[in-house]
Amino acid sequence: MGPSASHLRLPLGFVFLWAFPDKTFGLGYATASGKGRLDGGSPTKGFLGSVAAGPMESVFHSWAGQAWADRLFMLGLLGVGAALLAGIGVRLAAAAGTVMMALMWLAEWPPARHLSDGSPSMSSNPFAHYHLVYALALVAPAATGAGTTWGLGRLWARVPWLSRNRRLR
């Protein structure tokens, strides 16, 4: 499944990596121009601050805009994206990306019909959500060693200390 999983690894890597410059510079895609990190914007404030349902609502509101949350989120986008695209550290990147996506899914969970204020949530599905799909999709490249196809995974695996630490491949 190596080539098939690489077909998945590369676009997933691009999804994560692209978000980094967009959120850093405010390129006008998910992050409006003038709202990037370099302009003083917070990559977590909008998403986490707008959580409007679920048992974790107050927790995510307290994390929104916090410096530690912004730094971890940006580091995650850059690290997961670069590792997946390069094909190195795919297992570690997949684990980190899965945790990130699971937390983002949890922030929007439950995909209820109504928000905590009673207004409609506009949720289209009671379970499946794109963050959950991304989290599950990250498992395939990690499980199949997809970094060796169209990536630097073979060279990475030859590094002596990595041969003893398979989780870092």
For every predicted segment, state its role.
Residues 1-51, 55-79, 86-169:
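Extended, low-polarity transmembrane helix blocks
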